[in-house]
From Swiss-Prot:
Subcellular localization(s) per the UniProt record: Cytoplasm
Key word GTP-binding present: no
Function according to Swiss-Prot or TrEMBL: Required for maturation of 30S ribosomal subunits.
NCBIfam families the record matches: PRK00092.3-3
InterPro entries referenced in this protein's UniProt entry, alphabetically: Ribosome_maturation_RimP, RimP_C_sf, RimP_N, RimP_N_sf
GO biological-process terms attached to the record: ribosomal small subunit assembly; translation
Name the record gives this protein: Ribosome maturation factor RimP
Keyword Transport included in the entry's annotation: no
Gene Ontology CC terms: cytosol
Family recorded in the similarity comment: Belongs to the RimP family.
SUPFAM superfamilies recorded: YhbC-like, C-terminal domain, YhbC-like, N-terminal domain
Pfam families xrefs: RimP_N
Organism name: Microcystis aeruginosa (strain NIES-843 / IAM M-2473)
UniProtKB keywords: Cytoplasm, Ribosome biogenesis
């Protein structure tokens, strides 16, 4: 379940990221830790996301969070890049990584775990499309648990 502060945090973080030429990929507020941890994953729209991007976003977001007083009490702010092994979820990510090697995890018609590997061709409301060595594969989205980049094959 998403923390109730996430919409407010996104509303605050997205314009800050855009000002810096960045995109907010994900926000997670971990209240089970003491102090709570606010993790914001960002991506540089113009190239590789570096330490400088994380530092700039951290300074700007921390200032805004402190002035808005959205988070009660002490917290830890973590800004990071999601990395190549992350799970794809948004339509923008599926568009950005079209042609990249992915691993689709799901289950077959009997409910047994199954894994498909191939180059991402796209997705629509019903299916995810892969290319496996020149052969098209259509996977029903109702059977899919996750789609993530295949870091072992992305450097090839």
């Amino acid at each position: 379940m998403t923390h109730p502060l996430i919409p407010d945090l996104l509303h605050l973080a997205i314009p800050i990221a855009e000002n810096l030429g960045l995109e907010v990929v994900d926000i997670v507020f971990q209240t089970n830790k003491r102090p709570p941890v606010l993790r914001v994953d960002i991506r540089n729209l113009a190239g590789d996301t570096g330490l400088e991007d994380c530092e700039q976003m951290s300074r700007a977001l921390e200032t805004a969070l402190d002035s808005q007083e959205i988070l009660p009490g002490a917290y830890v702010l973590e800004i990071s890049s999601p990395g190549i092994s992350r799970q794809l979820s948004s339509e923008r990510e599926f568009q950005s990584f079209k042609g990249f090697p992915v691993i689709v995890t799901g289950q077959d018609s009997q409910g047994k775990p199954q894994e498909w590997r191939g180059k991402l061709q796209g997705r629509d409301e019903q299916s995810i499309y892969l290319n496996q060595k020149g052969r098209s594969l259509t996977i029903d989205r109702t059977t899919v648990i996750s789609v993530r980049l295949d870091e072992r094959r992305s450097n090839q």
